[in-house]
Amino acid sequence: MASITELIKQLRASTQAGFMDCKKALEATNNDIDQAIKWLRENGIAKAAKKVDNVASEGVIKLKLADQKATILEINSQTDFVTKNDQFVAFSNELVDLVHKHETTDVAKIEQLKLASGSTVAETQIHLTAIIGEKISLRRVAFVKEEANSSLATYLHSNSRIGVIVKTSKTDDKEFLKHLAMHIAASNPKFVSQKDVSADFIAKEREIAAAQAQSENKPKEFIDRIVDGRINKVLEEVCLVNQKFLVNQEQTVQQAAQAKKVEILSFIRYEVGEGIEKQVSNFADEVKAQMK
């Protein structure tokens, strides 16, 4: 019969749980490894429940382009350190394959899908939260199909924090598509062109520009003209086709695309944590949180 030290070693290897947690689990289950794993999972889930309200604003972007379709998703953690954890990496890789296969963007439905382990995505997230000690959650998913008259390209930045899918008219110029996707990642446009800009966006920007002009004590008779100029500048910044192409600053993206006889149809750009308000805590609060 294996010694208690050997059992603890086996249990730690199987669950990644801490030494004392493994010791308690074995004591509670009369040194039965299988029951101890179950005990740790049950208690781990209980511990994980304390973390579900934590803000997970770090994480990774995952991309997959295959079979004439592209999938992009964001998985969040509380710190970027976790993104290098082997179990987190394995989970995120398996998850993007699963989502790509099922062609769904509904997070609630995805969380009920089963992974190779037999556990659902939701169960696995809770399990990872328990053993890693940080909230792990799938935040959002997008999915794009490539039709006969279109082409897709993807780009994932080296730190896996920014990912892009871009869809254009049909082209075999893979280098241009790659550069276009990289440009979108770096320049962060909000729209393809001005026709995609909402009236609400323009109205809000006009309000901001007018307030700025008034605060600068510009003559009232010139304010409308100043506002128009600033709106045009904003549209240059937020519309992809109006931006200077990073590969060749002498051209706009539109001019570069026209030279290649390519029409840009749509794009999706994900950046980790965008739109999430991050938690700010002082050192004392962090210590207290660790002691709970």
UniProtKB/Swiss-Prot annotation:
GO cellular component: cytoplasm
Keyword Protein biosynthesis on entry: yes
One Gene Ontology molecular-function label: translation elongation factor activity
Signal peptide start and end residues: none
Residue numbers spanned by region Involved in Mg(2+) ion dislocation from EF-Tu: 79-82
The keyword Transferase is assigned to this record: no
Alphabetical UniProt keywords: Cytoplasm, Elongation factor, Protein biosynthesis
Transmembrane regions: none
Location(s), subcellular: Cytoplasm
Function: Associates with the EF-Tu.GDP complex and induces the exchange of GDP to GTP. It remains bound to the aminoacyl-tRNA.EF-Tu.GTP complex up to the GTP hydrolysis stage on the ribosome.
Xref: PANTHER family: ELONGATION FACTOR TS, ELONGATION FACTOR TS, MITOCHONDRIAL
Family: Belongs to the EF-Ts family.
Name of the protein: Elongation factor Ts
Organism from which the protein derives: Mycoplasmoides gallisepticum (strain R(low / passage 15 / clone 2)) (Mycoplasma gallisepticum)
